[in-house]
Amino acid sequence: MMNFKFIIHPNKMFLLPIRLALIKRSCALGLWCCASLVHAQNMTGIRLTQAQIQDIEIFGHDDNSIGSSESASKGVISSEMLVSRALLRPAELLEYIPGMVVTQHSGDGKANQYFLRGINLDHGTDFATSLNGMPINMPTHAHGQGYSDLNFLIPELVQQVEYKKGPYYAQSGDFSSAGSAHIAYRTRLKEPFAELSVGLHGYQRAVAANSTTLGEDLHLITALERMNNNGPWSNPEGLRKTNALLALSQGSKNNGWSNFFSAYQAHWNSTDQIPSRLLTEGQYQGQAFGLFDAVDPSDGAQTNRYSLSGEWQNLNKTHIDKINWYSIYSDLRIFSNFTYFTDPVKRPYGDQFEQFERRNTLGGALSRSWLSDDRGTYAYINTLGLQLRQDFIRLGLNNTAQRKVMQNVRDDQVKQLQIGLFAENEVYWLEWLKTIAGLRLDQFDFQVNSFLLSQNSGVARSMKMSPKLSLILGPWHKTEFFFNHGQGFHSNDARGVTAKFDPVTQQAVSPVPGLTSSMGQELGLKTQAFKNLQSSLAIWRLNFASELFYNGETGTTQAGRPSERKGLEMAHHWTPSDQLQIDAALAWTRARYANNDPAGHFIPNAVDKVANLSLAVRNTRSWSGSLGVRYIGAAALIENNAVRSAPSVTTNLRIAKKINPQTDITLDLLNVLNRHNNDIAYFYNSRLNGEALSGVEDLHLHPSELRTFRLGTKIKF
């Protein structure tokens, strides 16, 4: 019997009779046919009681079936999928999202490099992430706008990941133009566990978690993680990471509350991207130089993150109420050197710089959804919500040498307030026709106090109204069609919004807008027309009024030219048997600047093709495993497309053996084919000691790790 899971979204719970009626026509499974009797009863005036509503929960695999989405590119990844693959880094959980790529261009303690829909998202510029309702992206961040550090995630505790693509959702605000991922932790465990893993290059990881019931329906989870890793680098990474979690909850997801406390600390050495000319020459300053060597071995960072967050939800016959809140403290000191010695007159000590920040964030959201009494045609949900966020930030930039401060460049205190108000109307006009209309209003207040250049101090306010519209048709023959249109935005760094002078050259500059608009459309379908196969297809378009791009010479994101992207995505989930699961995804993108410029129309680092293939074997007596293959296509590195990155293929393998009901052994083989890939490549000017003062335009790359393994043992108590 297939272990099938269908989780009903709480916002759609009152429309369960309609969902089941539609599914009844498209699926012959006995469970769904029985559930359709509930539809018949409701249509004749018999209503579900509150207790019955709370108890409806169908366990299974995922929530991508017909009737569960507002677009073809939306889905939910279940915990069963999340534990099946080998992961090099925690953030690679996001690679379950079709078309998403997660890499790293420096030390493994910093936020990853993300790519989706032909956008180099840098560390999160246009992809919003959240954990248990708490946003992870950081605006006006010292290292990059929208910085999204997921290294504090404990993958074993993740219950599900809900993902959306495009600016079509009224609940999604800043940084969500390309998409968003909403990660949910478990609030209870089936059984406590302890896991120990070891691998090459000094890799060691230990994680333990316990679940306790305190009184009636009160649940406590405690978890602790410790990880050490040196990586393949000649200058050992020395990553030391400590992670702790407390979770207290009561009730169910639909009627209950949960509170989370998280603490995370990490420090590491970084091997930043290196110039390809050094690899050709094979030596630097009389010493041999190879792929995993560092030009400046003093690069590195340390970070801390502490958070308190909570969620509460109440569902009854007439409405759904939701409240979430969060308080976050974080800090970061990161030392980088991407250009080495470009100005030996002004900076004889080299180009290393420090980006630092300390941040306190307070925020929350509340919403109410009104449910119609009519359970048939013209049934509706009306939702009104409010989101608030206040950031208090001290951040800056210093020129450094060997991590010693040589010159202060920027030192600012920023207060940034975000207020978002959204409204949404969802209506079933006919049994096969549904519309979702939304409107979002955002206001950002920026207040900057510049300690080193007072002229750059100031206040500013930006507002943006973003309409949304979705049309859902079907299902017919187990196939559903979608049309989505929406406007979105990303915020820009507050320091750029109030800037009047360049802090280095003292020349006058023009401030950037506080909010930059985006607009997207999508046409797609989802189908289950073939037995045991779920498929989706999306054709999409996304325009930005200003492209955020990564500047390799400064290590920052900057506002640039307007852009236009269009593409196609396909995803398939096939379970030919109870033991075998196959997932395949393909994404193609055409990305161009939208205005005329002699430099060219190509957008640097806009990956044109991404493909993933995964095979998982499970539900056998004692063995299980998975094989994952990821393809990343080439990308233009400069605007005229004269220099391109190389495509890459990475293959990961996981083999697991159940020794007894309490003990599992897992072997992960990462990059099993030992391919020489690059995690990232840039093309820009840099200068090594002894080179001409003008420097050299060159390809700079950060290699992927070669074949490595990790052996783990998990004991359940």
Which residues does each predicted region cover?
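Extracytoplasmic beta-strand/coil segments of soluble accessory domains associated
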Residues: 59, 66, 74, 91, ...
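Short acidic/polar hinge/loop motifs at secondary-structure boundaries
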Residues: 135-165, 184
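Short strand-turn segments of transmembrane beta-barrel domains in outer membranes
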Residues: 165-170, 179-212, 229-234, 522
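Transmembrane beta-barrel wall of Gram-negative outer-membrane proteins
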Residues: 198-228, 233-273, 299-320, 370, ...
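Face-selective signature of the C-terminal outer-membrane beta-barrel domain
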Residues: 251-264, 301-451, 529, 533-539, ...
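Membrane-embedded beta-barrel scaffold of Gram-negative outer-membrane proteins
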Residues: 311-313, 320-338, 474, 480-486, ...
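Gram-negative outer-membrane beta-barrel transporters
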Residues: 367-371, 443, 536-545, 559-639, ...
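C-terminal beta-signal and adjacent terminal beta-strands/loops
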Residues: 489, 540, 634, 657-717
